[in-house]
A protein has these predicted regions:
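Positively charged n-region of N-terminal signal peptides that target proteins for export
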Residues: 1-4
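Functionally critical loop-and-helix segments that line ligand-binding/catalytic clefts
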Residues: 20-61, 205-206, 210-306
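Short catalytic/ligand-binding loop motif for oxyanion handling, primarily in non-cytosolic enzymes
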Residues: 123, 189-192, 255-256
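Catalytic domains of cell-wall/extracellular-matrix polysaccharide-remodeling enzymes
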Residues: 148-236
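Polar/charged alpha-helical tracts
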Residues: 75, 79, 134, 138, ...
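Substrate-binding cleft of extracellular glycoside hydrolase catalytic domains
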Residues: 29-178
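C-terminal motif of bacterial Sec signal peptides marking the signal peptidase cleavage site
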Residues: 12-15
C-alpha cells in the first residue's frame, strides 16, 4: 500500500471527529525527533471503528516517546482503540514473512484478524489468487482462533487492467466462497477504466466493498482529475460504488531518512498524526459503520475460522 508525498504540517492535528474541532499549536518540543506521546483516544473515536494494516515493513522506527508494538505483541494497538488488524499475506508472487505472527498476536489481543494480497501486473492474477488462498487456508488451520473469521482483501496496483482484478476476485471466490474487499489507490488509470466499464463489469466490481486510500485533501490532483478532496469525492471519481466501506486515512512517508506520518486532516475529518500514544507511525483505517456492522462485515467477507 503506497504512501504519498508528505505535506508540511505546522499544527498539531486534532483528534478524530466527524465534526470540525479546534487545532492547537504544538507544545514546546513537539517538533523534536522524539516527542511526548498523547493520551490514547476513545475506543471508537468519531463513531468510526479503527483498523490497522501491517506488513513485513512494520513496525517502523520510533519517532517519539510512547508505546511500541511488534509482530508478536500488538496489545498497544488494541489499548489505543483499534478493532481489527489486516496483515499483508503476499505481494506479486512473494509471501510476507511477518503475516502469521501479526495475525496470531492480533487474535490473542482481541483484534479482528484480516489479510490482504498486493496484486501486481507482472504476475498472472490467478496464480497470485492461488498463492493468497493457499496461504489463507494454511493460516486458518494453524491455530485455534478466538475470532470467527479472517477478512480477505485484494490490494490492486494502480496500473492493473480491470480484467486482472476480476480474475483475482473470481478465483478467490471460487476457492473460498468469499468476495474479497477491493483496495484501490487514488489512481487516474483505474478511474478511467471504472468509468468506461460495461454494466456487467461494474456490477461485478460493486460486489466487493470499496477500501479507499486518501491521506490528504490535496492528494491526487492531475491533468485528468482534480484532487478528490474527501473520501466521498474519491468515490464519485471512481463512478462505481455508492459509498466507501473502509478508508485508509493515515500512513507513512519517507522523509529525511525516517518514516513520517501522512494523515488526513481537513474539513470534518480530523485525525492526529499518531495513533493514540504509540511511539511510531502506523497504517490507519476507519470502517464506515457501527461495531455490530463491522462484525457482520468481517464475517460476510471473511473465511470462517470456527
Amino acid at each position: 500500500m503506497k504512501s504519498l508525498l508528505l505535506l508540511p504540517f505546522l499544527l498539531l492535528l486534532a483528534n478524530c471527529s466527524t465534526s470540525p474541532v479546534p487545532v492547537l499549536p504544538p507544545p514546546p518540543g513537539e517538533t523534536e525527533p522524539l516527542m511526548e506521546a498523547a493520551a490514547p483516544p476513545p475506543a471508537y473515536s468519531g463513531g468510526m471503528q479503527q483498523i490497522i494494516n501491517v506488513s513485513a515493513y512494520d513496525p517502523k522506527a520510533p519517532l517519539r516517546h510512547g508505546r511500541g508494538y511488534s509482530e508478536n505483541d500488538v496489545s498497544a494497538l488494541r489499548a489505543n482503540g483499534a478493532s481489527g488488524l489486516i496483515a499483508r499475506a503476499g505481494k506479486g508472487g512473494n509471501l510476507d514473512t511477518k503475516c502469521a505472527s501479526f495475525l496470531t498476536a492480533a487474535d490473542r489481543s482481541g483484534l479482528l484478524p484480516g489479510v490482504y494480497y498486493r496484486v501486481q501486473r507482472h504476475v498472472d492474477p490467478v496464480a497470485q489468487a492461488d498463492q493468497f488462498v493457499s496461504r489463507v487456508q494454511s493460516l486458518a488451520r494453524s491455530r485455534s482462533w478466538q475470532a470467527p473469521a479472517l477478512l480477505l482483501c485484494g490490494d490492486y496496483d494502480g496500473d492493473l487492467p480491470l480484467a486482472s482484478i476480476l480474475r483475482f476476485m473470481d478465483r478467490v471466490q471460487s476457492r473460498t466462497g468469499v468476495i474479497p474487499v477491493a483496495y484501490l489507490e487514488n489512481s487516474p488509470q483505474l478511474k478511467l477504466q471504472t468509468r468506461a466499464a460495461d454494466a456487467a463489469t461494474k456490477a461485478r466490481l460493486r460486489q466487493a466493498p470499496y477500501w479507499l486510500a486518501l491521506y490528504s485533501h490535496e492528494s491526487g490532483a492531475g491533468p485528468i482529475f482534480p484532487a478528490p478532496g474527501t473520501p466521498e469525492g474519491l468515490v464519485d471519481q471512481y463512478h462505481l460504488w455508492s459509498h466507501w466501506t473502509l478508508w485508509q486515512y493515515g500512513g507513512a512517508d519517507w522523509e529525511r531518512g525516517a518514516s513520517r506520518p501522512k494523515v488526513y486532516n481537513a474539513g470534518r475529518y480530523r485525525f492526529r498524526p499518531f495513533f493514540g500514544n504509540l511511539d511510531r507511525v502506523v497504517e490507519r483505517n476507519v470502517f464506515r459503520g457501527s461495531p455490530a456492522a463491522l462484525a457482520a462485515f468481517w464475517q460476510q467477507h471473511g473465511l470462517r475460522l470456527r
